[in-house]
Amino acid sequence: MSFVTTEIQDAVAVLTIDRPKALNALNPEVLADLKAAFEAIDQNAVRCVVLTGAGDKSFVAGADIGSMSTMTKAEGEAFGKLGNDVFLMIESFPLPVIAAVNGFALGGGNELAMSCDIRLCSDNAVFGQPEVGLGITPGFGGTQR
């Protein structure tokens, strides 16, 4: 099952992170699906990309803490590297990438929105890096964007 859906409408690729029950939280599978979705975009047929989250509660509520809690040190390092690589790919994508932020954009979700060129926000958009309050450095390049 893919956690990222792609729709092409009038030369606009709409990528939707589709885990609304988990508030679209990021885990290795979501990041791999997001990477694959960007790599599959036909840059000759598409003029821009809109990235959003399914449901109305959350763009991306951050990393999937449940998934992270079972990772070994090596798996955690690989997860951080994958997230950083995917976000750098989005940041340097040759087409404009627009984050359509609906609800929470926390932690990795805020970092994901920051990796996009433009952020369009609903009235209920909330941004933050709550991990810094726990003494944890943002893992996907959020201190550099």
Where are these regions (language model features)?
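Hydrophobic/aromatic residues within transmembrane alpha-helices
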Residues: 15, 51, 64, 112-114
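A short, glycine- and basic residue-enriched loop/turn
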Residues: 20-23, 56-57, 62, 68, ...
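CoA-thioester-processing core
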Residues: 86, 90-92, 100, 106-145
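Glycine- (often His-adjacent) and acidic-residue-rich active-site loop
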Residues: 53-89, 105, 135
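Hydrophobic alpha-helical membrane-association signature
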Residues: 30-33, 79-82, 112
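Conserved CoA-thioester-binding segment of acyl-CoA-metabolizing enzymes
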Residues: 1-52, 88
